[in-house]
Amino acid sequence: MSNPITTAEVGRNFANPCSRWHEKGALPYQTDGKLAFQRLRQPLFTPAIRPGFRLRREDKLFAIGSCFARGIEWALIEQKMDVLSKTTKFDSFPAINDEARLGFTNKYNTFSIYNELCWALDPAAKFPRKSLVDIGDGLFYDPHTNPALQLASLEETIHRHQIIESVTRRIAQCRVVIITLGLAEVWRDKVANIFLNHAPIRDAVRSHPDRYEFHITNFAQNLSNLERIHTLLSQFGHADVQIVVTVSPVPLRATFSGEDVVLANTYSKSLLRTVAQEWAAAHKNVHYFPSYEIVQNSDRLVTWEEDLRHVTGKVTEHIMKLFLRHYLAGSPDTPYKLSASPNPVPAGVGRGKTTISWSSDGDAAAVVYVSKDGAEPAFFASGSHGSEEAGWIEAGATYEFSLNGGPNLNTPLARVSVTRLKH
């Protein structure tokens, strides 16, 4: 449960121009409109995003989770970021289809993400070799990797997972960890007493029909897994590890629940979305990024490939541009500006005046706050850009103006201090 919010914070939150869905008399097709019913008419939805930390160019990053994590990974690589989850070590892994090489590390549920991190980071944890399945003809199946990986001998199967563990171990060097949550439907191996990364392949079920059972996991189970992941990264990871959690917008390929796949997918994504929110609320170094909402609230014709499962490159590019704009300090995609003119304010009779100008590159949720001599910040203005006069500048006082991506005051996008000359 999140902490109570003070009335002062509520006032700042309500000043957020993106806090309202509709207002009487507002024009629905106003392209720079801040109301939800205006922004939702754009082909690509742009939500108000409040970054909880700043990503630095020299930071190392690691992406783990569902296949959507791979799209995020490549976008960061194109920005010349140091993404340690990228590797050439998987180039020798043979696939049975056109699965991307990095796809061999896809982790589709919170159980498999935790398992892989535990085996890689905790010296006391050992990979359960008894979960490897003898399919026959000298071939073995590893249910903790991607099912697109071709079967191999026991020795080769173990060797492959050792490579995956060695790559996953790099996460300990990374200040920024991006975790993408994918599925709530999970399979369990009763013999090895462990949850799997994906549904067991047909040959495994055919050879061992009573070995596996299907689970529709709940909120408590998934939150518990994320808490255990947080403990692992806190104990074995970077001293200032920052975790960005997202929910993959890619829907279920199929459901084993007996429900309509659309209903099953809605349950899965809703559960993971609320789990992510609860996890982020519990830890200052866990931050939710709304890639799921961006996709779901964009134009369907722009968003999806023909299968209505995979997101188009255009949307992934939009998502990553928003991520970099808000999180990456010094990014060319973050042209936030805040200025005061004149500054310092000339001496004179009465209170002085200065004009505060700001620009947030189209961020409709941008808010300018002002604090006098370190007092509680107060709302000054809002909007993606603009100019407002501050006509109450006193000599001997310092006014700190800050441009924020919404009511969050912890990570201002730009600052300017204003003073007035004395006689």
Task: Cite the ranges covered by each PLM segment.
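Extended, solvent-exposed regions of the mature portions of secreted/cell-surface glycoproteins
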Residues: 334-423
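Extracellular glycan-modifying ectodomains
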Residues: 1-333
